[in-house]
């Protein structure tokens, strides 16, 4: 079920504060965040966020195409190594 329109997009307050502080300083540094659940807003375009995936911060450069999606969508938490090969089939 999607979020109700009257509530508006959810963004953790500390993410907004960090983004605003970085915009004011003018430096283009990675903003480390742990909030994968926060929605990407138009004022985040052009900034780089380090989204935590449980092990490390994955750098995410925000573009206009990402607006309205969540930060967690761009920082995968699981590593896929492929399906295990059948040992009998390998020997033949």
Curated annotation (Swiss-Prot):
Molecular function terms, GO-annotated: rRNA binding; structural constituent of ribosome
Disulfide bridge partners, by residue number: none
Keywords: Ribonucleoprotein, Ribosomal protein, RNA-binding, rRNA-binding
Top-level division of the source organism's lineage: Bacteria
Tagged with keyword Electron transport: no
A GO cellular component annotation in the UniProt record: cytoplasm
Record has RNA-binding as a keyword: yes
One Pfam family per UniProt: Ribosomal_S19
Gene Ontology BP, a term: ribosomal small subunit assembly
UniProt xrefs under InterPro entries: Ribosomal_uS19 (IPR002222), Ribosomal_uS19_bac-type (IPR005732), Ribosomal_uS19_CS (IPR020934), Ribosomal_uS19_SF (IPR023575)
Family of this protein: Belongs to the universal ribosomal protein uS19 family.
Function of the molecule: Protein S19 forms a complex with S13 that binds strongly to the 16S ribosomal RNA.
Protein name: Small ribosomal subunit protein uS19
